[in-house]
Amino acid sequence: MAREKFERNKPHVNIGTIGHVDHGKTTLTAAITSVLAKKGQAKVQDYAEIDGAPEERERGITINTAHVEYETDGRHYAHVDCPGHADYVKNMITGAAQMDGAILVCAATDGPMAQTKEHILLAKQVGVPALVVALNKCDMVDDEEIIELVEMEIRELLSSYDFPGDDIPIVQVSGLKAIEGEAEWEAKIDELMDAVDTSIPEPEREIEKPFLMAVEDVFSITGRGTVATGRIERGKVKKGEEIEIVGIRDSRKTTVTGVEMFRKDLDEGLAGDNCGLLLRGIEKEDIERGMVLVKPGSITPHTKFEGQVYVLKKEEGGRHTPFFAGYRPQFYIRTTDVTGQITAFTAEDGSNVEMVMPGDNIKMTGELICPVAIEQGMRFAIREGGRTIGAGVVSKIIQ
């Protein structure tokens, strides 16, 4: 059978289900596929298929994730669902599953629980821009007042983590009853998908953002000058444009005198391309791996930041022993290791943490020895002697 061609006639959005264990994330995911399948917009996937997600490795960390795709009238969605709580933590921090928005699943029978809170905090820290709430298992609650109380509690919780709690849609659903084909609950899944369509904004495409390419290698070509190679992370670059070299040393501007890919000249390089940029008046010594080439003024180098970090367990190849504030690892940022120091660890409630154990999910403050182009929402790894011992995301730039 010939492979189906991916039709790109609708905008594409990445979403996922988050929330407390046993509140019905996977059942709801299965319900979305079963309801949309009746309109020919999805392939039915049952609970067992989604729950038995294969292991994936992202930066050496093992994560179980199920990927489901479906479409609504206006959009194409890629949806991720994770079987275990630890998988969510790792997934969101490593950015293995980049989410443009998420469906927060909360059972009406329980209300918000510990992991409901932790997932909302994580979503905030890693920069998930928008949430929609699916209040699940509503078929099991007869008392309308209880449902109202749970909704109020969820709204207050969302607001306490700086999400617009009063405006986020909360849709009463029953994943199980929708799968069983009960019409009123199938209609609720449609209502949920309408809320997702309207409340989760379409992501800005990488190509429309300001140009950035991290330098992987530098060559000098006799008679032509210096070429920096790498993958264009976002935006585009044309021959003749001015760019800025940022990070490690003082920023400086130069002009791109050529863009080449596979030894052929291009008019312009686009997001996703691996290419070489020929730079005017730059010596090979002026530029090194770890610097970035950017649209002038679009990014400034920083040394101090806050990050949300997952510390690998011993079984994942991480450390066997705890570490403390003052620890000096390498931070692997884009294409290079930069030495830095972790000056403080903070718990969820804002209190200081003395000791961090393998397997922890923690907020840290880091300081690098030289300024690098770091940005909010950017992923990094923490390494020690060349092996990864943690994965993190920049939650805030300090200086």
From Swiss-Prot:
GO molecular function: GTP binding; GTPase activity; translation elongation factor activity
Amino acids binding GTP: 19-26, 81-85, 136-139
Domain of life from the UniProt record: Bacteria
InterPro entries in UniProt: EF-Tu_GTP-bd, EF-Tu_GTPase, EFTu-like_2, EFTU_2, G_TR_CS, P-loop_NTPase, Small_GTP-bd, T_Tr_GTP-bd_dom
Region described as G2: 60-64
Annotated stretches, region: G1: 19-26
Ranges for region G5: 174-176
Subcellular location: Cytoplasm
Region of interest: G4: 136-139
Pfam families reported for this sequence: GTP_EFTU (PF00009), GTP_EFTU_D2 (PF03144), GTP_EFTU_D3 (PF03143)
Catalytic activity: GTP + H2O = GDP + phosphate + H(+)
Chain residues that bind Mg(2+): 26
Any one cellular-component term (Gene Ontology): cytosol
Stated family: Belongs to the TRAFAC class translation factor GTPase superfamily. Classic translation factor GTPase family. EF-Tu/EF-1A subfamily.
Subunit text: Monomer.
Protein name per its UniProtKB record: Elongation factor Tu
Gene (name only): tuf
